[in-house]
């Protein structure tokens, strides 16, 4: 057992902090400390407040984050908090443009050209393409929306990303270097046609505009709803947690 004054912190990236707190005798001492992976490299730490979290508990955790060299940002308790809630909108656009005619490689090239540290499809390979696929299986939702049909197809072929040596990209043994795979492009087109899409040319400018504005719009909603303390905090989340280019203003 922990002492009564102990802070109870969870590293969850999505679970409801208030629901976790409701299962304890001390909801005022419960909050989220969402470290970003890989934690020894990524500087962001989301400190997620629940409805009952005491101010001194939040202050203590923000101070701890600063002491260990993190960019600690206070976030409200909503699905995905600040960073992952915005990421969902960005990811949706990155997948929609592929259904419409772009390839995963073209999407990554466009966004890395804009200044992102890593394109979304390279990110999916690093995180693991199978994470969403397995959660869909557990939830019993079948194939899900067309935007994830390509992921499903890759996973059915055991192409789970970097860890399996093949995902949206190919990887040589012992290497993390992503190699463009034309087979992925062909599968993306097949999936889009199956979903009823007719391919068109999608420019790099359109890819960047749609993906980045999805981030901007969701960030504005989060600020308006009070889940972020300031626009600067949202900038810090994306610069230090997701590799948004500082020269673009955060």
Describe the residue ranges of each PLM region.
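N-terminal glycine-rich phosphate-binding loop for ADP-containing cofactors
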Residues: 1-250
């Amino acid at each position: 057992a922990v002492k009564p004054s102990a802070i109870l912190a969870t590293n969850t990236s999505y679970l409801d902090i208030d629901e976790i707190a409701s299962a304890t005798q001390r909801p005022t001492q419960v909050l989220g400390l969402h470290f970003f992976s890989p934690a020894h490299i990524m500087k962001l730490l989301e400190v997620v407040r629940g409805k009952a979290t005491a101010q001194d508990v939040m202050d203590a955790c923000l101070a701890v984050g600063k002491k260990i060299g993190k960019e600690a940002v206070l976030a409200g308790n909503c699905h995905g908090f600040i960073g992952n809630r915005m990421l969902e909108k960005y990811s949706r656009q990155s997948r929609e443009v592929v259904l419409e005619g772009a390839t995963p490689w073209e999407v990554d090239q466009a966004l890395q050209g804009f200044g992102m540290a890593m394109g979304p499809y390279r990110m999916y390979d690093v995180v693991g393409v199978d994470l969403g696929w397995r959660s869909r299986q557990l939830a019993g939702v079948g194939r899900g929306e067309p935007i994830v049909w390509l992921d499903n197809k890759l996973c059915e072929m055991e192409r789970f990303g970097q860890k399996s040596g093949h995902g949206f990209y190919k990887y040589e043994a012992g290497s993390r270097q992503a190699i463009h795979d034309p087979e992925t492009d062909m599968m993306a087109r097949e999936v889009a046609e199956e979903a009823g899409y007719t391919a068109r040319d999608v420019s790099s400018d359109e890819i960047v505009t749609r993906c980045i504005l999805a981030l901007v719009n969701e960030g504005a909603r989060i600020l308006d709803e009070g889940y972020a303390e300031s626009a600067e905090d949202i900038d810090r989340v994306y610069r230090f947690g997701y590799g948004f280019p500082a020269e673009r203003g955060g």
